[in-house]
Amino acid sequence: MKKVMGIINKKDGIMGGSYGGFMTSWIISHNPNTFKSAIVERALLNWETMVGTSDIGIGFPEMYLLDDMSKNINLYRKKSPMTYASNITTPTLIIHSQEDYRCPIEQAEQLFSNLKKRGVKTAMLRFPGESHELSRSGTPVHRKQRFDHVISWHKKHLV
């Protein structure tokens, strides 16, 4: 991964939202000590608990993973970043909106609890009244707060 992404040393940060948040958590759980800072936003982190709790529909995980959870629960677990969360050592900021029904907030709470319990540097921002679209169409005050925290987190851990 380091060669492909052009990462030479641990001076870089990583962040992503939605699928990018999924990938950020996947990358930091499979490549510990690669990044100095991470920000996971509005991410799907656990396929198993997302089924039936997301507004995207109960068929989405089956369509994406190409298998029925009741027939192959191990695939759902194998493809979930939460399965590998115990490998994460990167300081991680988690940003989630309380009214996010696409990737319900319990997804973020699972990751935050795991990291906090293990002593990983972490923080979680919860934005009341905001949806999955916070970074694009949230209230101006919340969008500014989010941006300020992103800058602050990376400054704290990258500088």
Predicted regions and their residues:
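Active-site-proximal cap/loop segments of hydrolase catalytic domains
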Residues: 1-159
